[in-house]
Amino acid sequence: MNKRLILIGLCLMLFCRISLAQQVLSYATDVTRSLDMTKGQTTKGISKTGLPEIQINSSIRYQEIDGFGAAITGSTAYNLSLMPAEARHTFLEETFSPDKYGFSYVRVSIGCSDFSLSEYTLCDEPGIEHFGLTIEETKYVIPALKEILSINPALKIMGTPWTCPKWMKVKSLDEPVPYDSWTGGQLNPACYEDYAHYFVLWIQAMQQAGVPIYCVTPQNEPLNRGNSASLFMGWKEQQAFVKQALGPAFRKADLAVKIYAFDHNYNYDNMPDQRQYPLHIYEDADAARFFAGAAYHNYGGSPSELLLIQREAPDKELVFSEASIGTWNNGRDLEKSLLRDVEQLGLATVNGWCRGSIVWNLMLDNDRGPHRGEGACATCYGVVDIDNTDYTTITRNSHFYAMAHMSVAAKPGAYRIATNEEAVDGLAYAAFINPDGSYGLVVSNRGEAQQVNISLNGNAAFVAELPAKAVVSYSWK
C-alpha cells in the first residue's frame, strides 16, 4: 500500500512538472486596474491562423540587462521607516524579491537630493578630513538598503551627488570666486582631488556599512543650475574631472565601481554646445577609458537619442537613471499614464540599448512628500504613495507597473533578443533570454482586446491573449 502511494505521489509530481513546463506564465495590468499584476497561464506550443505575429529570434542578442527599479531617496527611506516593520517588509519583499516582482536596481544620492530631509553634503566643514555620513544615511537610507539587500542580495546600487560641498564651489569658471549656495555654481578645479576622494570615502563608508555600490555618476543633471541642490558641470568639466581625478582615484583605491557620464535629459536642456554630451567626453581616449557609458533622464527630448549615442559609441553602455511622475503627467491615473510609462521607461529604453531603467522616488506620502523647498519638486508622486495617516495603505502608480512588468520578464543578466523589425500595429514590445534559459516578453497593447501569435526561432510558442489597453509580461522555458 505504501509503495503504491509513493508511486502515485511521484507520478503526480512528474505530471505537475510537465504541466508547468508546458505553460507560459503571465502578469497583466490594464488601465482600469481590473487587472493589477494579475497572474495567468497560457499553453505553450500552439498558434492560430490569421493572427498577427510577434516573431522572436534568440540567436540575435543585444545588450545585457542589469535590472529595473527606483530611487531610495531620503524621503523614501524616511517614509519606509515610519511603516510598521511587518508591513514594510511585506512591501519590500513583494517589490524586490526575485521570486516576486524582482526590482533589482536602485539609485541613491551622495549627500542630499531635492527629496532629502535637509540640505547637506557629507563634508560641509572645509577640509576633506571632515567627511562623514549623516543621520539621513545612518538612520534612514542605509537601514532601508540593508533590508532590501536581505531580500535581494544581488541588488545594484547607483550613487549620484546633487552638489559638491559648498566650499568646493566657485560662482563660475570665468568668475572663480567662492559660491556659498546649494543651488548652482561650478566645481573649483583646485578641488578636483578632494572631490574625487569624497566619492572614494562615500563608497568605502557604504561598503563598510554593508551596502556595496555598483556604479556612480559624477553629477545629477549637470546642465540644471536651478535644482534644490545642484552644480553645473559641462562636458568639458566632467571630462577633465574624471580624467584627472575621479578615474585615477578609483583605480588607486582599487574600486571596481562603474562611472556613467552625463545623467541628464535626452535634449541636453537645449544647450547647443552640450549636445551629445557623452560623445564629446569619449573623444578623449584617456578620459573615455574611465567611463562605462552614459545615463539619461526623460524630462526633455526623445529616447531616440539613445539610438544615436549607441550608434556612435557602440562599445559604451547606456542606462536610464531618472523619470518622475506627478500632477503634471497624471501618474496616478492609469488611463493616461500606464501604457505611456511602460512604453517610454521600459520598452523604449531597453530597445534603445539601455541595460536598465531606474525611476525616481520609490515611495512618497499622499501629500507628495517630504521634499525640499525652493527648486524641489512639490508636485511629484512616488512609484507608490503611502497614506500618511496610517503608514500602511499603499497605492501603486504608473511607474510601479512599468518597472514591475519589466522586472518579471527580464532578470539581471538577461539579454535583449531580436523581434520583428516592423512592429505589430498598436503594440510595443521587447523580448529577452534570461540566465536560466527562460524567455521573457513584455507587450503593451493600446487597442482593443486581441490575440497575437508568438513565435520563437520560427516555431509556435503560444497565443498571447492581450486585454484592451493593457500591458502583459510573459515568461516561459
Feature roles, as predicted:
Residues 66-67, 99-106, 152-156, 209-215, ...:
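Loop/turn elements at helix/coil->beta-strand transitions in domains of secreted/extracellular proteins
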Residues 35-213, 234, 244:
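N-terminal catalytic cores of secreted or lumenal carbohydrate-active enzymes
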Residues 1-23:
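Bacterial Sec-dependent N-terminal signal peptides
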Residues 317-402, 417-420:
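Aromatic/acidic polysaccharide-binding cleft in carbohydrate-active enzymes
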Residues 465-477:
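C-terminal beta-strand-rich structural cap/linker in extracellular carbohydrate-active enzymes
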Residues 70, 102, 157, 216, ...:
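Conserved, mostly hydrophobic/aromatic
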Residues 408, 419-457, 469:
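Carbohydrate-binding surface patches
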Residues 194-215, 222-328:
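Active-site neighborhood of glycoside hydrolase catalytic domains
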